Structures are given as structure tokens and as C-alpha cells.
Swiss-Prot record:
Organism: Methanocaldococcus jannaschii (strain ATCC 43067 / DSM 2661 / JAL-1 / JCM 10045 / NBRC 100440)
The DOD-type homing endonuclease domain, residue ranges: 77-205
Name used for this protein in its record: Uncharacterized protein MJ0398
A GO molecular-function annotation: endonuclease activity
Highest taxon, organism lineage: Archaea
Amino acid sequence: MVNLKELSQNEVLELINYVKSLRKQNFSYSQISKKIEIERNIKISKSTIIRWCKNSNNPFNKTKFIDLSPSPELSYIIGVYFGDANIYYRKKTGSYYFRIKVVDKDFVDVVKNSLIKIGLNPTISYVEEKTRSNRWHVEASSKSLYKFLSQNKEELFKVAEKYPEDFLRGFFDSEGYVTSNKIALENYDLELLEFSKELLKKLDVHSTIHIAKKKGTESNIRGEIYHYKDDFYRLSIHRKESVRNFAIKVSFSIKRKRERLQKLLESMDKH
């Protein structure tokens, strides 16, 4: 049996509308409760149904109501989520969070503004760390965003397809980099890279995917020896026109990455 607290924001809204429609059809409160339990395996009390029908209860009093309809900002957040960001549940406080830790202040500013745009109130902090570079943290509390991002990635892809430039910018801001001859992005998730490749193709950006590190390959990270748990993939953009189209249509939010991209274009123009 599913509890109301386990439902997403949109699922609760849909359920409220369904409850009200049943009431208009002259179902009793008890009948509505039983019908929802049988049809949807959702446990909802008679008293809650009464409050909903009389508009005397707001189920979002303790939940930030945010705009999860497709938008450039939400698409960007999804791209960032597939890269550097993570979501987690803090059991002590019973709160759900979206968080990202990065070295670039301009990056966290864009993430912060995107979170604000969809209705959240994120916080930014600067944390000094002994074992790695000091980093900026941006964090926002939202059960609705947590549940939204916890969906199958195919559902998130639907938003990304509506705003491909923003999704790709978020993903490349997180995982992308520029070398002397290419733009590249690395990730364990081959399906995610293939999806990104298709989006790039629609923007006239040719890219290729290959294995950057095979499973089991040894790596030294800050003095610690690690082994790749799975094949690690790289998506690369080499062709001059594709690099140019990427710069025009996607680019980076991060200044240092934009500057490297400009240098790559200047180098390509000389040859």
C-alpha cells in the first residue's frame, strides 16, 4: 500500500483532482477512500478526503511547490544532475536535497539561478577541503525535485528533448572539457552519451563515442589507487564546423571553459 508521502507533487495534484471529480459524481467520502485504495493501491483517510473536497487542507504546506513543467532551466538542471550533482535524503531532518560541489563560482551561480527559476530557495557556501581543491556548494531542499530526478532517465530525457541546448550545456558544464584538438565529455553511462550524441546531431554537431578506460584499469587519484568499476566512455567533438556549431548553440556557462573553447576555434582557423 502506497502512502501519500511517497507520491510526487504532480501525483498528489492529480489525485486531489480525481477525488474532487468522484465527489461531484456523488461518491461518499468512504466510497472514495475505498475506491482509491482498490484502484491505485493508495491509502488515504476519509478525513483527508473531506479536507481536500472542502479546500481546507493544502498538502504542500510542508513541501515547496515548484514548477516541474518542461523549461530551459529544468532541462539545464537535469543535465547538471547527470553530471556533477546528486540528490540525497537526510534522515535526521527528514529532508530531501539537490546538491552540487564544484570549483567554479560562475557555474554554481547558474545552477542557483536555475533552481530559483523553478521555485526553489537554494543556498551557496564555500568549503575549504584538505584533500582536494576548495569548492563551492549549492544546495536546495525539495522532495518534489528529488522524486522528479529519481524517475527513470527516459522520463528526464523527454524534458531534455524539448530544450536540448540547455540540457547539453548543463551536462557539458558538469562533465565536459576542451583540449587542443577537441571538446569531450566522459561518463560511465553509455545510454546517456548516446542520447547526448543524438541531441548534438540535431544541432548539426557531429560527435563520436569510444571507450576511454576499460573496466579494471588502474588510476591514481590524489595519491589513492582506484580501478574503474566499468567501462568508462568518452564522447568527442573533433570536426571544425561541429566545434563551431557547439560554441554557437551550446557552449559553456563556465568562463574558463568558454575561453578554452575560443582558443580551440582560433587554433582550428589557423589550419
